[in-house]
Curated annotation (Swiss-Prot):
Record's signal peptide: 1-28
Keywords assigned: Cell adhesion, Cell membrane, Disulfide bond, Glycoprotein, GPI-anchor, Immunoglobulin domain, Lipoprotein, Membrane, Repeat, Signal
Organism: Gallus gallus (Chicken)
Function in brief: Mediates selective neuronal growth and axon targeting. Probably serves as a recognition molecule for the formation of limbic connections.
GO terms classed as biological process: cell adhesion
Top-level taxonomic group: Eukaryota
Name by which UniProt lists this protein: Limbic system-associated membrane protein
GO CC list: plasma membrane; side of membrane
Length: 338
């Protein structure tokens, strides 16, 4: 807001005299005859605003006023604001320049001109536009599958920014008209990932921020690879599972947990676990069980190591035939890192 200076008491008679000469007695500035309608000037925050005013001759007495009071009376500056100056590119111009415009400068400004014939006023309404700026957005969150999720994105700007949400996937859906809040009911694992909030108006480029949503879900076996191998050769059984958090794996043979020993080695990395047999013997042939577990659940799959030529073609299958006590024990063991 353009501030107004207080005149020194010693100068008060002179100031009053000047104002009496400038403004007709008994005629308020805002009640004089209007020769022009109100002009609107739109300026972006931080730019310079030029409010134009012209007089008919050099003998005219001129003043600039706003809702706070007098800014300039003739050549005398009443405002304390250093951003405000007169713009006089010709003898008949009496324009007002406001640098680094801010929102509190918005409002009506009046150029009052006292000529030899009658007073005139010209009104200008300054509109300050503000680029969009996201002021608050939800933090990254982790939820369990099936939960309800509400994401919040708040933005400031003039005109008021339009907010849109978008799920950042190759086929990401754009949620139009959601305003500040994006609600996801019964979230699924496919809805995990980054969500982008965009705040836009016509003043400047949109402001964009992101929030990551992590969805926890229990393991699901995505691949279980059985294999054949001759005695004396190496063999490999592979088990993969999808889960968040990343699953832990265990291997069983005839209800007995397998450890990396006696020619057997287990390598688990991320969502994959490998059971490797260094030197296949007759006792290695048969059924193996891969168990994947995290804090939300446990699942298993049966895989086979068989002799070449037996005709068994089996890429493994999810099996529920494993005793429940084994699944429960596996989950407990995995969660306790036994």
């Amino acid at each position: 807001m353009v501030a107004r200076a207080q005149p020194d008491r010693k100068q008060l008679p002179l100031v009053l005299l000047r104002l009496l000469c400038l403004l007709p007695t008994g005629l308020p500035v805002r009640s004089v005859d209007f020769t022009r309608g109100t002009d609107n000037i739109t300026v972006r925050q931080g730019d310079t605003a030029i409010l134009r005013c012209f007089v008919e001759d050099r003998s005219s007495k001129v003043a600039w006023l706003n809702r706070s009071g007098i800014i300039f009376a003739g050549e005398d500056k009443w405002s304390l604001d250093p951003r405000v100056e007169l713009e006089k590119r010709s003898p008949l111009e009496y324009s007002l320049r406001i640098q680094k415009v801010d929102v509190y400068d918005e409002g009506s400004y009046t150029c009052s001109v006292q000529t030899q014939h009658h007073p005139k006023t010209s009104q200008v309404y300054l509109i300050v536009q503000v680029p969009p700026k996201i002021s608050n957005i939800s933090s990254d969150i982790t939820v369990n599958e099936g939960s309800n999720v509400t994401l919040v994105c708040m933005a400031n700007g003039r005109p008021e920014p339009v907010i849109t949400w978008r799920h950042l996937t190759p086929t990401g859906k754009e949620f139009e008209g959601e305003e500040e809040y994006l609600e996801i009911l019964g979230i699924t694992r496919e809805q995990s990932g980054k969500y982008e909030c965009k705040a836009a108006n016509e003043v400047a480029s949109a402001d964009v921020k992101q929030v990551r949503v992590t969805v926890n879900y229990p393991p699901t076996i995505t691949e279980s690879k059985s294999n054949e191998a001759a005695t004396g050769r190496q063999a490999l059984l592979r088990c993969e599972a999808s889960a968040v958090p990343t699953p832990d794996f265990e291997w069983y043979r005839d209800d007995t947990r397998i450890n990396s020993a006696n020619g057997l080695e287990i390598k688990s990395t991320g969502s994959q676990s490998l059971l490797m047999v260094a030197n296949v013997t007759e006792e290695h042939y048969g059924n193996y069980t891969c168990v994947a577990a995290n804090k939300l659940g446990v699942t298993n799959a049966s895989l086979y190591l068989y002799r070449p030529g037996t005709g068994r073609v089996d890429n493994g299958s999810v099996s529920l035939a494993v005793p429940l006590w084994l699944l429960a024990a596996s989950l407990l063991c995995l969660l306790s890192k036994c």
